[in-house]
Amino acid sequence: MTPEEKREIADKILKAIEDRYGFVPLVNQVLSEDPDLFIPTANLSKAALESDTKKLDPKTTYLCAVAAATALGAEHCVRAQGTHAKAASVTKAEMMEAMFVGSYMAMTRSQSYAFRVLQDLYKEE
């Protein structure tokens, strides 16, 4: 495939993203500068979140995405996935619960690291 053909595919993907969501996330904008990176990344995103063969319904998928983005502290991803979740009929209470689950997982992860250090530091006391 020529560089021009790759650029054309990348531009079509960007247009589809903008048409679907009303904006193009910064990550996609930057990655699209290198079609060899952007095209497979966009395909993976579509497979993970929008595939016709997915086992999870869109509401559940986007609740998972909100929880994961929350756990990672990815502010812009929380907003983007939250917007998709709301469009998939997720209620405010459901969204808040997913955010709590993600927050809790992040909290226990940091506690896990910290408390292991604590145990190591004071194991003989």
Regions found by a protein language model. Name each.
Residues 1-58, 113-125:
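Acidic, glycine/proline-rich low-complexity segments that act as flexible tails and inter-domain linkers
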Residues 78-83, 113:
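Short conserved catalytic/interaction loops centered on acidic-Pro-aromatic/His motifs
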Residues 64-80:
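Short, thiol/selenol-centered motifs that function as redox-active sites or metal-ligating centers
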Residues 81-92, 118:
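Iron-sulfur (Fe-S) cluster-binding segments and ferredoxin-like electron-carrier domains
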Residues 46, 65, 82-86:
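Amphipathic alpha-helical segments within well-ordered protein domains
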Residues 100-117:
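Short Fe-S-cluster ligation motifs
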